[in-house]
Curated annotation (Swiss-Prot):
Name this polypeptide is given: Trehalose 6-phosphate phosphorylase
EC number: 2.4.1.216
Catalytic activity of the protein: alpha,alpha-trehalose 6-phosphate + phosphate = beta-D-glucose 1-phosphate + D-glucose 6-phosphate
Record: residues binding substrate: W342, D343, K589, Q590
Active site: E480
Alphabetically ordered keywords of this record: Glycosyltransferase, Transferase
One GO-annotated biological process of the protein: carbohydrate metabolic process
Temperature dependence comment: Optimum temperature is 35 degrees Celsius.
UniProt record similarity statement: Belongs to the glycosyl hydrolase 65 family.
């Protein structure tokens, strides 16, 4: 493996969304805080966006739009403590005009390093900066810088904590009120603010040095900015070093954030932060690296990039003290306002198999919001608990009723809140965690109540029809391009993904009852009826309709749209701009019915369909894959990995690999037309790692046993990674036509179709089939 497999390096200046996207990819974090990878010298502009976020810290604002008050709850962009300005002989240096630029994110050491060379009237000036975050003392982070010039001059460095910042990362959100906090206090090395409506106190303490000399505080023209400065005579070719140590805390997780940051600041330093950072990531890569040797130039690097961002989005060291989960963009940008979606389903299984304590921490975020979910259901006239499609601070619904169509710049209705399947995803995550860990305490700590209350919601929605089948109306599936029937409102009926996942949930509820968990009798009785009689629409070829009457929708001339527009991954917006609705057509944003295969596997889904007294042909998976692939535009990054996994099952390894390669580089290549500017796509990052491990390596941990049946692409000569299954660490190595397994404790496994007992610490070899 070479150095390039551990870094992303940018050597040319980019502008606009491409620059924003690079800064998202170069973000640092530790589960508690996220620091966007903008240059230290930059402020919010068309080309740069510094951002600092803390998990769980949200604020609400109100803006009048078309005569209506629109309430938005946003993950707060904190005051910016990483801003510097450099003056030479009294003139501000414009690093945007650098003649040389190099920006690097180092995954192995979790460092962001930037180098700028500027040509000035007197000669050349070079600035090198390195940013780092402390994963152990997770409130701490900092940076160091080096300056050298090939001439003598008066050097002045100013460093700031800028409390004038707004939430401005997402261009289409800028029309809304985006001032999230008010600065309440500034003193030497300390800025304190409070969010405007959620009233969370934010405290930032810092100390800055140049060659060991402390920066004095200076007056600022802006009373929202803490400024410090130091000035020296710089000799020709003299290298000077400066650094800043920063500690942040909020009243969301700390009782007295001001006292905390001041005490912690006196106890830490940039060297201590760097030491903790180095030690932490050394262990992460020892435990969690996925090594792939292949003929694809960027694959290994992309795999590590995805691991890096997932491990920054959450980690037990921080999350055990937080009431937070992982948003769809992690802590790297303000896309989707930092809200938590069903995307947890794409990352929680990864945590469960690699750092199970973190998975448990994230599940508690949902359990802690069960009361809010019950209130959501009550407000909507439903029973039980209804989790929101978009969740933030307290767990009420944060989805908007309107959204902006960026094709025609018109505000359109947003019905995405009807994706009630988010509740099924949460229960699924509980199940995956319990399967991989055997930790049933998550159930007694509120998980069982969550299962029961969401079951109440679903069974209340399930209505018995004249056909003797139970039907669920008024919902949406994962495919967001279908919000209702043509010309109607109110969602769709009998979404296959929803109905089959509910069948699965009712089966688990039954199993829990049989294991002695207390389930209300009436609930269990209705569950027994519904789990055998939910409705599906299956045609004569074995295609499972995405929802009832789906086959009656019109077909789309995709070739015509591609000829007219080129990129059609957001064909929904194109159609609406033309005055037609995707509700009328068989077109999908992403895998919907086929998400069942990603969640449960082919065999399990087959059993569920049979349980509902339907029959499928032997080739049903291929039939459904072909049918829906022809109608899917992959408007979500999470779509392709589903098809990749299915293609592995069908033996189409070349196409599976093509889907994987495209998906795994979603952010690096920014395949969604600039959306990485708003933060990385955490869901697809977790999903692609799962495809590598669960599909190509053939690992299955879902059914209570460690089972593996590898089928590597021909272009891969080696695959190596670890998994944790029920407390046992298993080292997996596939190379030279062999599978080699080493378990930390005795473990009964299934290799292809044979059961094998692994002995603790003994490497066991198997021939690949």
């Amino acid at each position: 493996m070479t150095e390039k497999d551990w870094i992303i390096q940018y050597d040319k200046k980019e502008v606009g969304k491409r620059s924003y996207g690079q800064e998202s990819l170069m973000s640092l974090g530790n589960g508690y805080l996220g620091l966007r990878g903008a240059p230290l010298w930059s402020t919010c502009s068309d080309n740069h966006y510094p951002g600092l976020y803390v998990a769980g810290v949200f604020n609400r604002t109100s803006t009048e739009v078309a005569g209506h008050d629109v309430i938005n709850e946003d993950m707060v962009n904190w005051p910016n403590p990483q801003l510097i300005k450099v003056y030479i002989d009294g003139e501000l240096v414009d690093f945007e005009a650098s003649v040389e630029k190099q920006a690097t994110i180092d995954f192995k050491n979790a460092l962001q390093i930037e180098r700028y060379q500027v040509k000035l009237a007197k000669g050349n000036l070079t600035l090198v900066t390195t940013k780092f975050v402390d994963p152990i003392n997770f409130h701490d982070f900092g940076f160091v810088g080096e300056i050298i010039a090939d001439f003598s001059c008066k050097l002045r460095i100013e460093t700031f904590t800028d409390g004038s910042v707004l939430n401005q990362n997402v261009e289409r959100y800028r029309a809304f009120d985006s001032k999230e906090f008010e600065v309440t206090k500034i003193s030497k090395g300390l800025l304190v603010a409070k969010t405007r409506t959620s009233e969370i106190e934010l405290a930032i303490a810092s100390k800055s040095f140049l060659n060991g000399l402390a920066f004095p505080k200076i007056d600022s023209e802006n009373d929202e900015i803490l400024a410090e400065a130091i000035e020296i005579d710089l000799q020709k070719n003299q290298e000077v070093q400066f650094d800043k140590t920063i500690v942040i805390a909020s009243s969301y997780e700390s009782k007295n954030p001001v006292e905390f940051v001041l005490t912690e600041l006196s106890a830490t330093s940039v060297s201590k932060i760097q030491e903790n950072n180095t030690n932490y990531w050394e262990k992460v890569w020892s435990d969690a690296d996925i090594v792939i040797e292949s003929d694809h130039e960027d694959l290994q690097r992309m795999v590590r990039m995805n691991i890096f961002h997932i491990r920054q989005a959450a980690q037990h060291g921080a999350n055990q003290f937080l009431d937070a989960s992982v948003g769809s963009r992690g802590l790297t940008g303000e896309g989707y306002r930092g809200h938590i979606f069903w995307d947890e389903i794409f990352v929680l299984p990864y945590y469960a198999a690699n750092e199970p304590e973190t998975a448990r921490d994230l599940l508690l975020y949902r359990i802690n919001r069960l009361t809010a979910a019950q209130e959501n259901a009550k407000v909507d006239g439903e029973k039980g608990a209804m989790f929101p499609w978009q969740s933030g601070l307290i767990g009420d619904e944060q989805s908007q009723f309107v959204h902006l169509n960026t094709v025609n710049n018109e505000w359109e209705p947003d019905n995405s809140r009807r994706q009630r399947h988010v509740s099924l995803a949460i229960v699924y995550n509980l199940w995956i965690y319990s399967q991989l860990t055997e930790d049933e305490s998550i159930l007694t700590d509120g998980g069982l109540d969550l299962i029961i209350e969401t079951t109440k919601f679903w069974l209340n929605k399930a209505e018995l029809g004249d056909d003797g089948r139970y039907h669920i109306d008024g919902v949406m599936g994962p495919d967001e391009y279908h919000e209702a029937y043509p010309g109607q409102e109110g969602g769709i009926c009998d979404n296959a993904y929803t109905n089959l996942m509910l069948t699965w949930q009712l089966n688990w509820l039954t199993e829990l009852s049989e294991k002695g968990f207390e389930i209300p009798k009436e609930l269990l009785e209705k569950a027994q009826k519904v789990r055998k009689k939910l409705y599906l629409d299956i045609d004569e070829n074995g295609v499972i309709a995405q929802y009832a009457k789906y086959f009656e929708l019109k077909e789309v001339d995709f070739a015509a749209y591609e000829a007219k527009y080129g990129d059609i991954h957001r064909i929904d917006r194109l159609m609406k701009a033309e005055g037609i609705s995707p509700d009328e057509y068989q077109v999908a944003k992403q895998a919907d019915t086929l998400m069942l295969i990603y969640n449960l596997g082919q065999e399990h889904v087959t059993k569920l369909v049979k349980q509902l007294a339907y029959e499928l042909p032997e080739n049903w998976l291929k039939v459904n894959r072909d049918y829906y692939l022809a109608r899917t535009v992959h408007g979500s990054t999470t779509s392709r990995p589903v098809f990749a996994g299915i293609d592995v099952k069908l033996g189409d390894f070349d196409e599976a690999l093509d889907f994987l390669i495209t998906a795994i580089g979603s952010d690096y290549y920014d395949i969604q037309g600039g959306t990485t500017a708003e933060g990385v796509h955490i869901g697809v990052m977790g999903e692609t790692l799962e495809v590598i491990q669960n599909e190509f390596a053939g690992l299955s941990l879902r059914e209570g046993q460690f089972a593996i049946a590898p089928y590597l692409p021909k272009s891969w000569t080696k695959l190596k990674f670890n998994q944790i299954f029920r407390g046992t660490k298993v080292e997996i190595l596939i190379e030279n036509g062999q599978l080699l397994l080493t378990a930390s404790a005795d473990l009964l496994t299934k290799v292809y179709d044979d059961e094998v007992q692994l002995k603790a610490g003994v490497q066991t070899k198997f021939d690949l089939k």
